[in-house]
């Protein structure tokens, strides 16, 4: 469902942000 899509997108976004912070 839509909520699952939101959860997946949020996790992906958090991963992306976390890795860019780690690369700083």
UniProtKB/Swiss-Prot annotation:
Compartments where located: Secreted
Expression (tissue specificity): Expressed by the skin glands.
Keywords noted in UniProt: Amphibian defense peptide, Antibiotic, Antimicrobial, Secreted
GO cellular component: extracellular region
Protein's GO biological process: defense response to Gram-negative bacterium
Family: Belongs to the ascaphin family.
Record's protein name: Ascaphin-6
Organism per entry: Ascaphus truei (Coastal tailed frog)
């Amino acid at each position: 469902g839509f909520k699952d899509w939101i959860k997946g997108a949020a996790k992906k976004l958090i991963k992306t942000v976390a890795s860019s912070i780690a690369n700083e």
